[in-house]
Amino acid sequence: MKEFAPAKINLFLDVIRKREDGYHDLGTVFQTVDAGDTVSAELRADGRITLCYNEPQDYPLESDLVFKAAKLLQQESGTTLGADIYLKKIMPLGAGLGGGSADAAATLRLLNQLWKLKYKNEKLEELGARLGADVPFLVRGGTAFAEGIGEKLTFVKSVQLPGEAHLLIATPHDAVPTKDAYAGVPKSGPDRWESYKAKCLRAGKTASIDFALKNLFNAFEVSVFPKHPLVEEMKAEFLRLGAKCALMSGSGASVFGIFETREQAKQAAEELKPISRYQIVTRFFEGF
């Protein structure tokens, strides 16, 4: 049994305030893309959970988000069943694409089926919130407004890129530690986010994607670009190569851009290879 784990990008991302618990309240628009990892599993009757990757990992199994998701679902449901899990990893980690969170969300969906638990999405999203802020959205995917630390979700009808447009995602060789992104990021208060959300929701489906693509925004660019100029350079290269718009995703370091055709996006991907470790041409994924 297999499950697709689509990555995500942020079409809009603002930092509203720092909370007393040390976390930050955000306002963002999540969008899944038709690119990601694949999680497979086979049933075990002895209750054991094993995890194998297509490439070596250098951290303990107990700290792996896929393993944590499997154990959490097993404990929550009380099932005596286990699973042999295999993860085909394609998306880069720590790239602002939600790769690890997507894998955890896919694991929840997959084992819910394998163990015949019949949990609804809402229950899986609740469990996902215990694993990470992006996991609840990635249980369902598609298009959603998110607030709080990302756990307060308003799903909207999924959108798709207009016409023959394609998305190019590229990840530079530089990595952006989360602390670098949050250090110095401006806290805007709620006004910009609330205004953006209201205008986007008032638009119809076609108008809303046009509005979103014309109003791409990521507050983290202000704090990331000075410390990680390769990310800023990559965004500039996207625009030089003909992207209609471009933006850093999440807290970095990946950048995405929209091109009018698949061929244009593929050509740009070739041009970006010298300054990036990962490139993929894709479209939006409409969710589960």
Regions found by a protein language model. Give the residues of each.
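ATP-binding N-lobe of GHMP and related small-molecule kinases
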Residues: 1-95, 113-125, 160-161, 171-174
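Short beta-strand scaffold segments in enzyme catalytic cores
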Residues: 13, 37-41, 134-138, 144-145, ...
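Solvent-exposed alpha-helices and their adjacent loops that cap or buttress functional pockets
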Residues: 31-32, 129-130, 136-139, 157-163, ...
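Short, basic/glycine-rich phosphate-binding loops at helix/coil junctions
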Residues: 45-59, 107, 207-217
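Glycine/serine-rich anion-binding loops at beta->alpha junctions
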Residues: 86-115, 133, 243-259
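Contiguous, small/hydrophobic- and glycine-enriched helical/loop subdomains that border
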Residues: 104, 108-145
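Conserved, helical-rich catalytic subdomain that frames metal- and/or nucleotide-binding sites
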Residues: 140, 145-245, 260-273, 277-288
